[in-house]
């Protein structure tokens, strides 16, 4: 669920070269459980979008105060973001994981490299003292995979690119979209415009349910007239209630 919530807090207007937004995440049974900062830089030739998210309260304890960072880096061509690299990082005490997607448009392939470092526990039995002696060591692993395909967007640029025209959609109109960076977006998601309400537009996103426990497979999100996310929501998550992300600044 963490990647979906992060995915749904990244819809911003491209009218400014630098933009910063703050969001909080809430679960109906626990209140505020997460926060995120979005920083968007675009000089007209290159862009860099960085999303930093972390849990608070009970979620912080459950995730060992883990911090998540998502980045999209690339070129700007005729006002359109063209991703070259997508990076997903996770940091916690004695833990680091960095997954980098490098897009080679010339050769129509994408290289996915993953680096992970974590502290693991090892125990040996001391037969003399009849006990287990526990030690810890840092273990590093590296993996690489090559996809024989490329995507127009990654899961961040998909919601930033103005040529996707979300605000121009009519009631009940749908868009099928795919993007690099997660199982949901690579296999394709369906965005549906539900209705306009005052100065806001309400949409739904059809998602996979493998990481939900009984929740709705449709998440909703609300954009204001500037194409900036106002709120997103997933209802009926077992044991947790409803998950809501709200803009606070």
What does each of the following model-derived ranges do?
Residues 64-65, 75-148:
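Structured domain cores in non-transmembrane regions
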Residues 17-105, 157-249:
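Acidic, serine/threonine-rich low-complexity disordered tracts
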Residues 124-179:
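Hydrophobic, aromatic-enriched interface-forming segments
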Residues 4, 133, 248-249:
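Small/flexible residues
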Residues 3-14:
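Sec-dependent N-terminal signal peptides
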